[in-house]
């Protein structure tokens, strides 16, 4: 059995803040990631689900408000900014849960004056693998083609399984100081460890949620999110050959819609290890339990896992002192 807790939300409901006055005063000044680590809050099932990610190279610094598109502080032309803003509106109108994320241009990966955009969608019929299209906005029709896909419905033609792994590390210090301080440090260490390897690209990115779990990382094509990473975790994370040493850093798969599914998939990841990325998983969520089938080469397993929800409690969600309720969830 393992306990999990939800990601930060705007405070609501009747969750009780059980901290003493001295603890609350201390928490107003301590970094949010330090508080979260000290509290023992587990990370499983804290990944916000999305249908689509739109990754766009945009020079930092980015806006300090997560609701403001990252390109609004760039030196881009009004035409480019307007097209991307219309893509956001188009995705919303199509009912697509799309997350637009800035990538800091990289000396090794990027083309000066020709920003890259990568669009990722959940693979149809595969809940933890993402397919992709890639565009260059400075090329003829590149901007229009990218925005048509980014702002359109799901399931368009042109998506393929990519050969390049994209590892995003949040370094958005304008939103949260823990993300800036810890994310930049982890990104630097990961880039040094990889050297000239271009089969994995490690990016500094804008906010992807879960500031108190900084440094946070999002890994594609698996769509797996990680938190509280340290430099000693990088050999395991980058090689992907084992899971156990960093399993307690796992936040969940952003392609799964419910916290119950994320908690169950996390338990399956612990049991099956890295091979789970190639599995076909089918979930059926009922009141109080989840049925799941696991199909791998030579393996056809079925499980029923019980879901236990605990009482909400308050946590410090970010370095600005915002508090929000989280609800523990266990599976067995």
What is each PLM-predicted segment?
Residues 2-3, 7-332:
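Histidine/cysteine-enriched polar flanking segments
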